[in-house]
From Swiss-Prot:
GO terms for biological process: isopentenyl diphosphate biosynthetic process, methylerythritol 4-phosphate pathway; terpenoid biosynthetic process. InterPro entries: GHMP_kinase_C_dom, GHMP_kinase_C_sf, GHMP_kinase_N_dom, IspE, Ribosomal_Su5_D2-typ_SF, Ribsml_uS5_D2-typ_fold_subgr. It catalyses: 4-CDP-2-C-methyl-D-erythritol + ATP = 4-CDP-2-C-methyl-D-erythritol 2-phosphate + ADP + H(+). This is 4-diphosphocytidyl-2-C-methyl-D-erythritol kinase. The lineage of its organism: Bacteria, Bacillati, Actinomycetota, Actinomycetes, Micromonosporales. The keyword Ubl conjugation does not apply. It comes from Salinispora tropica (strain ATCC BAA-916 / DSM 44818 / JCM 13857 / NBRC 105044 / CNB-440). Coiled coil: none annotated. The gene is ispE.
Length: 315
């Protein structure tokens, strides 16, 4: 359902609302894709990393459950029962026995279908916002249990930071890492890329012997996160889905090449793509690389980000 969002709805948060939640985008520093499981998912061994590109969800009291949105992808997303935000709110209501009544408004910056888990981020934001609005008082771990039924990335985006994901990605545990800030350039492509399509393409490439060797263990990546040198982390980045994304969107090869030519320490496709992310030596280098990519015809938008950052948080 949709409902008009009025400027006066943006008053400061009071005792009963509104509740505003910011939620970050996600990249995969390591995405190892195993065989297809009987439940239709692939076994994953991944390291998630939350970065400073945020969506914002505002929840207000209402007589029904409604959703409006603005920003990235406005007009392209259905705002009905199929939307992950609505599904998340209903899942929380169903688990806690409260009426699913809220007016939700999404301000979106994370690109749609870009390999940055934008939909999963918004589901995580809805769980945190509605939990506060409805006073259901769930812990982060309890919210993450509900999140696991909504999507593989959603539990991570409840927590944020940097974490190891196993199973289909929904089993999340924090990693031991130095308190280092890593600087990234995010090159957003025109259009999105379906995650299921990317996985099917990887299966096809592997069956044809046309995919690279699987990444395997996360040990090298996890060890790199315990070092302060971004060059060590750069050498450990990897994504088994990159072959599939490049097969489906060959132009991404030029984006990766341009980023590394501009001075990035390494570049990979983010998740299932088509966004590419580049690790920079520092903040100034990231700004320079983003400016160079923006001047070329290799992406729709290049922006800087840093990580790790917190997951869905009120404020």
């Amino acid at each position: 359902m949709t409902e008009a969002w009025r400027p006066e709805d943006d008053e400061p948060r009071g005792a009963s609302g509104p509740v505003r939640v910011r939620v970050p985008a996600k990249i995969n520093l390591h995405l190892g894709v195993g065989p297809l499981r009987r439940d239709g998912y692939h076994e994953l061994n991944t390291v998630y990393h939350a970065i400073s590109i945020h969506d914002e969800l505002t929840a207000r009291r209402g007589d029904t459950l409604t959703l409006t949105m603005e920003g990235e992808g406005a007009g392209e997303l259905a705002l009905d029962e199929s939307n992950l935000v609505i599904r998340a709110a209903r899942a929380l209501a169903g688990s806690t026995g409260v009426p699913p009544h809220a007016r939700l408004h999404l301000r979106k910056q994370i690109p749609l279908a870009g390999g940055l888990a934008g939909g999963s981020a918004d589901a995580a934001a809805a769980l945190v916002a509605c939990d506060a609005l409805w006073g259901t008082g769930l812990t982060r771990d309890e919210l993450a249990e509900i999140a696991a039924g909504l999507g593989s990335d959603v539990p991570f985006l409840i927590h944020g930071g940097t974490a190891l994901g196993t199973g289909r990605g929904e089993a999340v545990s924090p990693v031991l890492a130095r308190p280092t800030v890593w600087h990234w350039v995010v090159a957003v492509a025109d259009g999105g890329l379906s995650t299921p399509v990317a996985y099917r393409e990887l299966d096809r490439l592997r069956a044809a012997g046309a995919a690279g060797p699987p990444l395997g263990s996360t040990d090298t990546l996890l060890a790199a996160l315990r070092q302060p040198d971004p060059r060590v982390l750069a050498a450990a980045l990897g994504n088994d889905l990159q072959d599939a994304a490049l097969a489906l969107r060959p132009a991404l090869a030029a984006t990766l090449k341009a980023g590394e030519a501009a001075g990035a320490l390494a570049g990979i496709v983010s998740g299932s793509g088509p966004t590419c992310v580049f690790l920079a030596a520092g903040a100034a280098d990231a700004e320079r690389i983003a400016a160079e990519l923006s001047a070329l015809d290799v992406c729709r938008q290049a922006r800087t980000a840093h990580g790790p950052v917190a997951g869905a948080r009120i404020g």
